[in-house]
Amino acid sequence: MSFPYFISPEQAMRERSELARKGIARGRSVVALAYAGGVLFVAENPSRSLQKISELYDRVGFAAAGKFNEFDNLRRGGIQFADTRGYAYDRRDVTGRQLANVYAQTLGTIFTEQAKPYEVELCVAEVAHYGETKPPELYRITYDGSINDEPHFMVMGGTTESIANALKESYAENASLTDALGIAVAALRAGSADAAGSDQPTLGVASLEVAVLDANRPRRAFRRIIGSGLEALLREKDSKGSKGAQNPKGARDSKNSKSYGESTD
């Protein structure tokens, strides 16, 4: 007499968690961090059409790591939810916390009820409305529906430990856009070098996806930084780094940080 195969609920949850974590770790890394003007998103992404960073609503942005088809479905669902709520009530009723809670409920249901969990990790970020002084909000939503409030920065996908350690050492509150981009790119390089076991690789315009939630924009805060705008920011970052190496006691110059990256939404 044969007995039916039995697996305990605890073991089933462990196996699902392991599957999801491995899938997320195989993806390329994404960094989101607060800076003086709002929130900066930087992702390792050589593709120009398969984007990991997106606008959800007027003051709310989205970034993700993991399986593209899964987080893209979540992204589109979040946009539809935000548009419907903003139309039915008021645009200010759509908040980052609200969208993060919706994603957490969706992922929690998928994790417990479906045969395979989503191999995704999400970031929902929000900046204050124009004229307000509320600090940016960053929410991390994991594959099992857990939600955490991240005060300054967060890392998803790839070699998160080495990137997070680099950010802990170099992150500065209220940094300019140029400085924040330099911090994020240096951390991503540290993670890529750790994964490859070699020197830090070059991350340039062709291999980066960059966007910001700019709190100084009147309505739609999200804008992408692409092409010549991104190239100028990276060039300024490199020149400031070389000047800092030559004159480490020199004063920080951030006057030009707002003049770059004016690209399309």
Swiss-Prot record:
Keyword Lipoprotein attached: no
Keywords in alphabetical order: Cytoplasm, Proteasome
Segments of this protein annotated with the region Disordered: 236-265
Protein name as catalogued: Proteasome subunit alpha
Regulation: The formation of the proteasomal ATPase ARC-20S proteasome complex, likely via the docking of the C-termini of ARC into the intersubunit pockets in the alpha-rings, may trigger opening of the gate for substrate entry. Interconversion between the open-gate and close-gate conformations leads to a dynamic regulation of the 20S proteasome proteolysis activity.
One GO location term (cellular component): cytoplasm
GO biological process: modification-dependent protein catabolic process; proteasomal protein catabolic process
Subunit description: The 20S proteasome core is composed of 14 alpha and 14 beta subunits that assemble into four stacked heptameric rings, resulting in a barrel-shaped structure. The two inner rings, each composed of seven catalytic beta subunits, are sandwiched by two outer rings, each composed of seven alpha subunits. The catalytic chamber with the active sites is on the inside of the barrel. Has a gated structure, the ends of the cylinder being occluded by the N-termini of the alpha-subunits. Is capped by the proteasome-associated ATPase, ARC.
Keyword Cytoplasm: yes
Pfam families xrefs: Proteasome
Native source organism of the sequence: Mycobacterium leprae (strain TN)
Gene that specifies this protein: prcA
Pathway annotation from the record: Protein degradation; proteasomal Pup-dependent pathway
